[in-house]
UniProtKB/Swiss-Prot annotation:
Belongs to the RNA polymerase beta chain family. The lineage of its organism: Bacteria, Pseudomonadati, Bacteroidota, Bacteroidia, Bacteroidales. The keyword Transcription applies. This is DNA-directed RNA polymerase subunit beta. DNA-dependent RNA polymerase catalyzes the transcription of DNA into RNA using the four ribonucleoside triphosphates as substrates. Its EC number is 2.7.7.6.
């Protein structure tokens, strides 16, 4: 048990120096960094991600190979808008992608064509924020990693209806055709290409070069060759033939079209396979002119290879040519033009690098499975692969090998963001290269450049459709920091190329032993997606091949290696055959196991073994669970089903106005808060120089060299988000926790708020709870709350809604924002400003106008009255209608922010003033650029002082400053630093590094200034960037402060959820002997059947913590024991197990039995009654059936369904039933008559015919059946 200074938690973990958690967002951030490789110099980039896409698609040449477009390098420019601006304006946070391309001519006829190197704009790439998200059209989205079947070879088994076992081998590539080898009930092996046509496997073998029966049998060493002589053959009478005896002859015929004589080779079967050699056959063999025959080997176990003989019997082909033509006919259902084209089709299927790609993973898996040593660079199938797969299948049939477990994590891999983007860019660039080729072919003799060839929209349209419509690009769950971090670490088996809910069976959803330490067995959704969507465990990482690995410590001779080398990450495959000890197995100070028998894990078994047999040891007991499950204290005492609900409900906890970290935590809370990146953190050592509610300024320490090479100010400003709306309408509101003059170091958290307190995750509040019934109000999991919770804002949260109104240009004219709305009282528009937008601070009630807008009406002939009004008041009076945005029926709140974005619709006069401003902007920019370059040259002169050039070159490898020349101000000023090579300027390596850094920093600053100028020009000439067709966009943000109320859903961390049923005055709540009233009464019957005892442990320890003002960390599976609880309750002077007598708040009498009392952490969930309460009197109707719509969003009605009708029928309430089915629903005439009758006070009319009956009659008439109603 230890106490850490950082967060002052008493830790019950048995392991003192715990292995640190990896960065929880690494799965997203690293994948995207590896995709772009921006921090890597171009010459050192690995062939992966975006670089690999370019390498695969370039160079591009025209059909005659005259012109070649070559790829040199790619880079990105700074984004036009920052993240916050993109969210506010509804834009995508993206960076411009540019490529340096080289176009040259190889044709001597075009000598005048100069080689062109150009920077070409390829469109915007959505750029990942430092929080691992993408901002797409103003909304934060997450690209979820996909768990899919790994490329490679898979061996499976199925059972035919007649009980025969059928075996199959399927080769799955990254790109290209699938091929499957399968047996049938007749013990014949077939090959299926792309799940279409089947052909005997021997036909495929012939087509790939094993032409004769002899070649095929030799692969499996099944036949012996006998020279044909009479004496020789007589020795082998009674032996079986292994191959057909063929007579080959040539047939000549005249081609009718050309008149030429054409010869065709023919094969006649003289004796079939499996025939027994006898004296009659000998004569036939001698007559055929065959040189050699094949006989079955006598020493081979022929039954093992019976399938090969059976397949040869079914094989319709006798030579390579026949096999190739047969396969072509099967695949294409047509005759091939010639043998060469048929052969090309087969080569393209599996042996062409352009058409077929196993990928690095596929090759690795095939080599591993079949024990091959083929080079990792060979990404296509080889003959050896196919033969080895057939041999393995034969072993399977003979029960000498085992089938693959498809759910084993060695057979499933993860497609991370980077890989998914690689696939999308691959599609985009392939399309682009097609258009480039076409343009090259068309522009044969013209002078053209790379820019003329490339259409930037091709790539961006593919990438945008991926982010906008792909099932794995999801709207981020942003309810609280835990929800965010979990969403980014989620793995989905669904999506394109994955499973579908309907087809996924029980096995694929189930927990597998290889999930240990990789996929959480607890955290998965309830419902149709159970088991298909899972979460990464806390220590899990995804390796370069996409397999999930988990860390273990090595153990040798019963001693655990605690050194850095002793810790290693293992994939599911590497872990096979190893015995692994649990993370909390007792060890002595030397790392040796104390006990002579150790609980261990070996694949799916849990043996108890001596220490000498242990190979590895878990790094920590919490290795098995995900972040959310690791946040549940005493998880080991909860039933798994309830733990699943607990971990899922913590993601739904709304951030509260007043945050409060849990008294009983698990020790992972600080890491979650830090790695979620929702707080502002110091980047390095420095000093806080300014703090207020909206920003923090830090002056970072810099070394002399850093100071010298930098073009930036040493002080960095961080803006603090205030009441910022999240995707789920909860709020991010941070407040600073640092002060002026404070020294900070890298990773220090400087703010709190948004479910975070003092650098720890704080999703709910610590409240005093009693497990006792209270007047029946906590029946069936309902919760009784103390009024103090409402009064003191314990569970108060703030929710912000965004309301948008767009102004468009219509056919009838321009819409307009205004507070001058026709036929609306002054009272209704009192809070609108001159632009028609409600003022900040206004209180909003249902029906209030938020944004005033008028839109032109359709022209009709005005009446005399209208003519008069127009004559008096001008043209405005009658030709516009009110199109304002009004508050919905349930909306109440306060306006906290408004925004108006407009495109620059300019009059001639303002355009003239803009013309005058633009040159000034250019001048200002030129001055800034000049002073920046002067500063650069000054720095370079200091660095190159007294040094001579080693030959400074540009991208074309032309020497600009000659080798041996001295650096002068003039030579340095004349350089174009955008096209310069920054390495090896001088002979001093240290100075070279500084020169490189100075130039790179200069270019970064140069690009920033350039982007700033473009932005200013854009704002001036075009205005705000808005979607097409929209002239203005007004936004209003309304905050709602929601106290806890009856009907809200609350939950603990152990799956103990309930609805608030009554809020009781403080004086009426049950109280303890010292007069303390409890905050919450929970039903004790909610515990035994749910088996989530963790809540009781938490309550007792929480009470001790509150009394002693101590916070605890009890890590899962390694936390506080019952003895520890008793020790702390005794210290706190409270009853053991929390058993206390309570007194009735109403009468003051003591209850008969003691109840369990404690302090538990409770959350308020996002399911609030305010969002669900709804009532309808009249509202919209469905167009076809004329029945009321459903749902709160549509202002719909309550469905009176089949069972409700039965209930009224059972009571005999005929009139009520008729009314509900007619005038309250879809009797159109009846409902207007009923309304009229109610208004006039007349008796109710007779109901008419429901519209849905008319719909049915129309449908029947559509079928040609005529009906009339009498």
């Amino acid at each position: 048990m230890s106490s850490t200074a950082e967060n002052q938690r008493v830790n019950f973990a048995s392991i003192k120096n715990q292995f640190p958690y990896p960065d929880f967002l690494e799965v997203q951030l690293k994948s995207f960094q590896d995709f772009l490789q921006l921090d890597t110099p171009p010459e050192k980039r690995k062939k992966e991600g975006l670089y690999k896409v370019f390498a695969e698609n370039f160079p591009i040449a025209d059909t005659r190979n005259n012109f070649v477009l070559e790829f040199l390098d790619y880079y990105i420019d700074p984004p036009r808008y920052c993240i916050d601006e993109c969210i506010a304006r509804g834009l995508t946070y993206s960076v411009p992608l540019k490529a340096k391309l080289k176009l040259y001519c190889t044709d001597p006829d075009h000598e005048d064509f100069d080689t062109v190197i150009q920077d070409v704009y390829l469109g915007p790439i959505p750029y990942m924020t430092d929080r691992g998200t993408f901002v797409i059209n103003g909304a934060e989205r997450v690209v979820v990693s996909q768990l899919h079947r790994s490329p490679g070879v898979f061996f499976g088994q199925s059972t035919h209806a007649n009980g025969t076992k059928l075996y199959s081998a399927r080769i799955i590539p990254f790109k290209g055709s699938w091929i499957e080898f399968a047996t049938d009930i007749n013990n014949v092996m077939y090959a299926y290409i792309d799940r279409k046509k089947k052909l005997p496997v021997t036909t495929l073998l012939r087509a790939i070069g094993f032409e004769s029966d002899r070649d095929i049998l030799e692969i499996f060493n099944l036949a012996e060759e006998v020279k044909v002589t009479k004496a020789n053959l007589k020795k082998f009478i009674g032996r079986k033939l292994a191959a057909r005896v063929l007579k080959t002859w040539v047939e000549d015929f005249v081609d009718e079209d050309t008149g030429e004589v054409v010869s065709i080779e023919r094969n006649d079967v003289i004796i079939d396979r499996e025939s027994v050699l006898d004296s009659d056959n000998i004569e036939a063999i001698l007559d055929s002119g065959t040189q050699n025959i094949l006989l079955h080997r006598e020493d081979q176990n022929l039954s093992d290879y019976a399938i090969i003989y059976n397949t040869l019997q079914k094989d319709p082909s006798n030579s390579e040519k026949e096999a190739v033509l047969y396969i072509y006919r099967q695949l294409r259902n047509a005759e091939p033009a010639d043998e060469a084209s048929a052969r090309e089709v087969i080569t393209n299927l599996f042996f062409s690098e352009k058409r077929y790609d196993l990928g690095e993973v596929g090759r690795y898996r095939i080599n591993k499975k079949l024990g091959l040593t083929t080079s990792a660079d060979v990404k296509v199938l080889t003959k050896e692969d196919i033969i080895e797969i057939i041999k393995y299948l034969i072993e399977l049939i003979n029960s000498k090998a085992i089938v693959d477990d498809i759910d084993h994590l060695s057979n499933r891999r993860v497609r991370t963001v980077g890989e998914q983007l690689y696939n999308q860019f691959g599609i985009g660039l392939a399309r682009m290269s097609r258009t480039v080729r076409e343009r090259m072919n068309v522009r044969d003799n013209e002078v053209f450049t790379p820019i003329d060839l490339i259409n930037a929209k091709t790539i961006s349209s593919v990438v945008n459709s991926f982010f906008g419509t792909n099932a794995l690009s999801q709207f981020m769950d942003q309810t609280n920091p835990l929800a965010e971090i979990t969403h980014k670490r989620r793995l989905s088996a669904l999506g394109p190329g994955g499973l579908s809910r309907e087809r996924a069976g029980f096995e694929v959803r189930d927990v597998h032993y290889t999930h240990y330490g990789r996929l959480c067995p607890i955290e998965t959704p309830e419902g149709p997606n159970i088991g298909l969507i899972s979460s990464l465990c806390v220590y899990a990482k995804i390796n370069d091949l996409g397999f999930i690995s988990t860390p273990y410590r090595k153990v040798a001779d019963g001693k655990v290696d605690f050194s850095e080398e002793g810790l290693q990450y293992y994939t599911a495959e590497e872990e096979e055959e190893l015995t692994i000890a649990q993370g909390n197995a007792p060890l002595d100070d030397n790392g040796k196991f104390i006990r002579d028998k150790v609980k261990a894990r070996f694949e799916a078994d849990f043996p108890v073994v001596p220490p000498s047999e242990i190979d590895l040891m878990d790094v920590a007991p919490q290795q098995i669970a995900s972040i959310a499950a690791s946040l549940i204290p005493f998880l080991e005492h909860d039933d798994a089903n309830r733990a699943l609900m607990g971990s899922n409900m913590m993601r739904q906890a709304v951030p509260l106005l007043r945050t409060d970290a849990p008294i009983v935590g698990t020790g992972i809370e600080a890491q979650v808060a830090r790695d979620s990146r929702t707080q502002i953190m110091a980047e390095r050592e420095g000093e806080v120089v300014f703090v207020d509610a909206t920003c923090i300024k830090i002056k970072y320490d810099r070394t002399e060299d850093e100071e010298f090479v930098s073009f930036e100010d040493a002080v960095k400003t961080y803006n603090i988000p205030k009441w910022r709306k999240t995707n789920q309408s909860t709020t991010v509101d941070l407040k600073p926790t640092c002060h002026r003059g404070q020294r900070v170091k890298a990773g220090d958290i400087l703010t709190e708020g948004y479910s975070t307190q003092k650098g720890e995750l704080a999703l709910g509040r610590n409240v005093k709870v009693a497990y006792m019934p209270w007047k029946g109000y906590n029946y069936e999991d309902a919760i009784v709350l103390n009024e103090r919770m409402v009064r003191e804002d314990f569970f108060t949260s703030v929710h912000v809604d965004e309301y948008i109104l767009e102004v468009r240009e219509t056919k009838r004219g321009m819409e307009e924002l205004t507070s001058d709305i026709p036929n609306v009282s002054e009272e209704a528009t009192k809070d609108l400003d001159e632009r028609g937008i409600v003022r900040v601070g206004a209180r909003i009630e249902p029906g209030d106008i938020l944004i005033g807008k008028i839109t032109p009406k359709g022209e009709s002939d005005p009446s005399p009255e209208e003519k008069l009004l127009r004559a008096i008041f001008g043209d405005k009076a009658g030709d516009v209608k009110d199109a304002s945005l009004k508050a919905t029926p349930s909306l109440r709140g306060v306006v906290i922010e408004t925004a108006l974005f407009s495109k620059a619709v300019k009059k001639r006069k303002s355009r003239l003033t803009d013309k005058a401003i633009l040159p000034k902007l250019d001048e200002e920019y030129e001055e800034k650029m000049a002073s920046l370059k002067t500063l650069l040259v000054d720095k370079l002169l200091v660095l190159t002082n007294g040094k001579v050039s080693q030959g400074v070159k540009d991208y074309m490898n032309t020497e600009i400053i000659a080798k041996g020349a001295k650096f002068t101000r003039k030579s340095l000023e004349e350089l174009d630093y955008n096209s310069i090579q920054v390495s090896k300027w001088t002979a001093d390596a240290q100075k070279n590094e500084l020169i490189k850094q100075v130039i790179l920093n200069y270019l970064k600053k140069y690009k920033e200034l350039d982007a700033e100028l473009r932005r200013k020009k854009f704002d001036l000439t075009i205005g705000d960037e808005l979607p097409t067709g929209i002239v203005q966009m007004a936004k209003v943000y309304i905050a709602k402060k929601r106290k806890i109320q009856v009907g809200d859903k609350m939950a603990g961390r152990h799956g103990n959820k309930g609805i608030v049923s009554k809020i009781v005055r403080q004086e009426d709540m049950p109280f303890l002997e010292d007069g303390t009233p409890v905050d919450i009464c929970l039903n004790p019957l909610g515990v035994p059947s749910r088996m989530n005892l963790g809540q009781i442990f938490e309550a007792v320890l929480g009470w001790a913590g509150r009394e002693l003002d101590v916070k605890f960390a009890t890590p899962i599976f390694d936390g506080a024991t019952l003895d520890d609880l008793n020790e702390w309750t005794d210290k706190a002077g409270i009853p053991r197990y929390g058993k206390s007598y309570l007194y009735d708040g109403g009468t003051g009498e003591r209850f008969d039995q003691p109840a369990t009392v404690g302090v538990t952490y409770f959350l308020k969930l996002g399911h609030m009654v305010d969002d669900k309460m709804h009532a309808r009197s009249i509202g919209p109707y469905s167009l076809i059936t004329q029945q009321p719509l459903g749902g709160k969003a549509q202002f719909g009605g309550q469905r009176f369904g089949e069972m409700e009708v039965w209930a009224l029928e059972a009571f005999g309430a005929a009139h009520v039933l008729q009314e509900i089915l007619t005038i309250k629903s879809d009797d159109v005439v009846g409902r207007s008559k009923a309304y009229e009758a109610i208004v006039k006070g007349d008796p109710m009319p007779q109901p008419g015919i429901p519209e849905s009956l008319n719909v049915l009659l129309h449908e029947l008439r559509g079928l040609g059946l005529s009906f009339t109603l009498d």
